[in-house]
Regions:
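Thiamine diphosphate
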Residues: 3-180
Length: 180
């Protein structure tokens, strides 16, 4: 339907390795061209984030991720909530087209942004979005992605740990942004 009703020309549907989590109602919302899915902390860990409403917290983190890294980011978000750090997840539904204006308006509301993707850091969507943020005066961010090197065989968890993409590594990156 998207390809037939919009004037974007050819496009590719990238199927993630994992399915969308059915427990998060946001993943069932209608698709808006160029926009991802915002999962507020209060929806992810409602019992822990209620007292951490954004207006009452000192700092807020936004995780921007592709579908393949959602589970690691979700664990990091829950872990941060246990330490009284409010963090939301923005799951990218689109790489292109991307509603840049919407993304910048969203990103500007946060004290730090952690971009997490299962692609190569150089030339990936995280690099693109971090440059977009910098051009718009948003500078407290970090990019978590694979460096350009060979990784040994291993389980997904082992490879993510080697690439510093484990939930614990993602959490540490978020905490380091709050210290800036």
């Amino acid at each position: 339907e998207l390809g037939m009703t919009k004037k974007y020309g050819p496009f590719v549907i990238r199927y993630p390795k994992m399915s969308c989590p059915s427990e998060q109602k946001e993943f069932s919302l209608p698709v808006e061209s160029g926009k991802g899915i915002l999962l507020p902390c209060s929806e992810i860990v409602p019992n822990l984030c209620d007292p951490l409403l954004p207006s009452n917290t000192r700092s807020k983190i936004l995780f921007v991720t592709t579908g393949g890294m959602y589970s690691e980011v979700l664990v990091a978000t829950r872990s941060l909530a246990l330490e009284n750090v409010y963090s939301d997840i923005y799951s990218l539904r689109f790489i292109k087209p991307l509603d840049e204006k919407y993304f910048i308006e969203l990103a500007a509301k946060y004290d730090g942004i952690v971009f997490v993707e299962d692609g190569i850091i150089s030339g990936g969507i995280s690099e693109y979005l971090s440059c977009l943020c910098a051009k718009n005066g948003i500078t407290n961010f970090c990019v978590k992605a694979f460096s350009e090197k060979f990784y040994p065989n291993g389980t997904r968890a082992q490879i993510c740990k080697l690439a510093q993409l484990s939930p614990e590594d993602i959490k540490k990156s978020a905490l380091s942004l709050l210290k800036k």
